[in-house]
Swiss-Prot record:
This is Co-chaperonin GroES. Induction: By heat shock. The gene is groES. CDD domains: cpn10 (cd00320). Pfam families: Cpn10. The lineage of its organism: Bacteria, Bacillati, Bacillota, Bacilli, Bacillales. One of its GO terms (cellular component) is cytoplasm. It is found in: Cytoplasm. SMART domains: Cpn10. It comes from Geobacillus stearothermophilus (Bacillus stearothermophilus). The keyword Cytoplasm applies. One of its GO terms (biological process) is chaperone cofactor-dependent protein refolding. Belongs to the GroES chaperonin family. Its main location: cytoplasm.
């Protein structure tokens, strides 16, 4: 399993099927970049200048919304993941 370092978080992107108002399904090239995902791994948190470690606010299993162009896409064990900094997470859903 991927183990993120520092304040990084590994997420599995949740793809949504996009349709127009008339019901036409859009091809991948016309879709918006996804901004929703589920946390699958969390680093230990960031270290302040004082040496104190700040624990992450998200947990494994959280459903999140993140910045549109944030993170690095990686493929591991046949699945695609996104590794991003905790600061790129905008909100936890529910």
């Amino acid at each position: 399993m991927l183990k993120p370092l520092g304040d990084r978080v590994v997420i599995e992107v949740i793809e949504t099927e996009e349709k127009t108002a008339s019901g036409i399904v859009l091809p991948d090239t016309a879709k918006e970049k996804p901004q929703e995902g589920r946390v699958v791994a969390v680093g230990k948190g960031r270290v302040l200048d004082s040496g104190e470690r700040v624990a992450p606010e998200v947990e494994v299993g959280d459903r999140i919304i993140f910045s549109k162009y944030a993170g690095t896409e990686v493929k591991y064990d046949g699945k695609e993941y996104l590794i991003l900094r905790e600061s790129d997470i905008l909100a936890v859903i529910g």
